[in-house]
């Protein structure tokens, strides 16, 4: 039986920093997350266009700021934070800006959060946010920002993020609605 098809009764969530060896699992996890849950919020054309503006950003892995959440050795979720200007997008997304942010002046970025559809609503997103916020705070950042999909927005609102601006990204050929959100990090 496929390990993802088994019912999960009790989960033991573990986390670690992702490595290059995790790239195949990360790609599969992101593909499932984009294909599944986003379809409740976007048209099929928007879901397909999302693939152009979302995905693995290997800079986060190289910077050692990208977490992999596992359940019994299975990749269940991933996400990270960054001290770089880029707010969202994968290696293939045009317009990335690798310049560094300044703690205490700029907001750290929460980046590329995905949960496999089998593991939705089990605390994985909250766990990733906690890891990212704690790491950013430890590096001297007093606030974080992220760009949310329509599917992720409810999680971020529940975690005290506030809307900064709504916009659309049409680099995938169809406008995809997104929300820039932010949060103050309280010590």
Which residues make up each language-model segment?
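C-terminal "cap" of GNAT-fold acetyltransferases
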Residues: 142, 147-153, 159, 165-187
